[in-house]
A protein has these predicted regions:
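Short beta-strand micro-motifs within the conserved protein kinase catalytic domain, predominantly
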Residues: 86-97
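ATP-binding glycine-rich loop module of kinase domains
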Residues: 22-70, 74
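Conserved C-terminal C-lobe helix
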Residues: 249-264
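A conserved short helix/loop substructure at the end of the activation segment
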Residues: 262-274
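Regulatory extensions appended to serine/threonine kinase catalytic cores
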Residues: 285-309
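Catalytic-loop of the protein kinase fold
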Residues: 136-154
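Activation segment signature within eukaryotic-like protein kinase domains
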Residues: 125-126
Length: 309
C-alpha cells in the first residue's frame, strides 16, 4: 500500500462516483481517515518540458488554489456541530493536492426510505440538517451542492436518524463567490442557472435553501415537488413563474415552509436559522397551523420572535 504525507492508503484510490477527484481510505497514528486527491490543478515541476513562463503561471494558479481552499477549510473548521464532516488536513504532495476527513460510515439510506418514517422522526432528521446548515451559513459558507448523496444518514440507538453533511468541494465563502458556480440540475436554484449566462446575478447562501426545499420534500414524500411535464427540473418551472406543487402528504406547516424555500426571489426564502426555529417550536408542539412571522426584515407564514438570533 502507498503512503501519502504520512497517511497509509488502505488500497488504490478510485474515481467511482467521484467527479474530478480520486478517493479512498487511509490510516495515520491508528486513526482511520477518508482521503481525496484532486485531479486538478496539478502543480508543475521545474523539470517539466514546459517553458519557465508557463511553469510559473501554473504554479501561481496552484498556489492561489491552495490559499483559497485553506481559507475555506479553516472557516469550515469553526462549524464543529457534530453533523458537518470537517476537513482535518489539506496539503500538496508532489504535484497533487489532498484533503483528509474522518472516515464516516453511512447506511446508504435514500429519501424514499426516510419518507416511510413517522413525522417526528422525519422532523428530527430535518432539524439535524438545519442545525448544521445554519452553522456554516452563519460562518459565511455556501455548500452549493446540497443533495441526498451528500447527506450521510445514520440510524441512532433510539431509531431516529441523523445526517452528516459532506462534500464541500463545490462550496465557497459567500464573500468570495467564484465565477463558475454550478450544481446538480435536480437541486439547482433559479439564480445559479441564470448566473451561467449572466455574471451579474447575485449568488448567496439561499441557493442551499432552495436545494433543501427539494430535499425535504423528498424526505417527507419520497418524491420531488411536482411540476408540469414540460419541465425537467424544479428551477425551470420556478423561473417561468410556476409554483411547484407541494404534496398534500406533508403537514400544512411543512407544505408552507417548503413553498417559501422554493421562492424565485432568494430574499423570500427563509434562513436556515429561521427554519430551524420553526421545526424546533412547531414540530415539538405538534402544531399544524402557522401564525404570521418576521425573520429579520422578511415576513413569512410562520412566527419567529423579533429577538430571535
Amino acid at each position: 500500500m502507498g503512503d501519502i504525507n504520512g497517511y497509509r492508503l488502505d488500497g488504490e484510490l478510485t474515481t467511482q462516483n467521484a467527479g474530478f477527484c480520486k478517493w479512498g481510505f487511509c490510516t495515520k497514528n491508528k486513526h482511520e481517515y477518508f482521503i481525496k486527491e484532486f485531479l486538478s490543478p496539478v502543480y508543475p515541476s521545474n523539470q517539466s518540458e514546459l517553458s519557465q513562463k508557463v511553469i510559473e503561471r501554473k504554479q501561481r494558479l496552484c498556489e492561489n488554489f491552495y490559499i483559497e481552499k485553506k481559507e475555506f477549510y479553516n472557516t469550515l473548521s469553526q462549524c464543529r456541530t457534530g453533523n458537518n464532516v470537517i476537513i482535518e488536513d489539506f496539503f500538496r504532495a508532489g504535484s497533487k493536492y489532498y484533503m483528509i476527513t474522518d472516515k464516516i460510515l453511512s447506511e446508504g439510506i435514500d429519501p424514499h426510505i426516510i419518507s416511510k418514517l413517522s413525522d417526528d422522526r422525519k422532523e428530527a432528521l430535518i432539524r439535524s440538517i438545519l442545525y448544521s446548515v445554519a452553522a456554516f451559513h452563519e460562518a459565511g459558507i455556501v455548500h452549493a451542492d446540497i443533495k441526498p448523496d451528500n447527506m450521510l444518514l445514520k440510524q441512532t440507538e433510539n431509531s431516529f436518524y441523523t445526517a452528516k453533511i459532506i462534500d464541500f468541494d463545490s462550496g465557497f465563502l459567500a464573500s468570495k463567490v467564484p465565477d463558475d458556480v454550478q450544481g446538480d440540475f435536480l437541486y439547482l436554484s433559479p439564480e445559479v442557472f441564470q448566473r451561467m449566462s449572466d455574471s451579474s446575478v447575485v449568488i448567496s447562501e439561499k441557493i442551499d435553501i432552495f436545494a433543501l426545499g427539494i430535499l425535504f420534500h423528498q424526505y417527507w414524500t419520497g418524491t420531488f415537488p411536482a411540476v408540469t411535464s414540460e419541465y425537467h427540473y424544479v428551477f425551470e418551472a420556478v423561473l417561468d413563474g410556476y409554483s411547484p406543487v407541494i404534496s398534500t402528504q406533508t403537514p400544512e406547516h411543512i407544505r408552507s415552509m417548503i413553498q417559501q424555500m422554493l421562492s424565485l426571489n432568494p430574499e423570500d426564502r427563509p434562513s436556515a436559522r429561521t427554519l430551524l426555529f420553526l421545526f424546533s417550536s412547531v414540530g415539538d408542539s405538534h402544531q399544524n397551523d402557522l401564525p404570521h412571522v418576521q425573520d429579520s426584515k422578511k415576513t413569512y407564514g410562520f412566527y419567529v420572535p423579533t429577538d430571535f438570533d
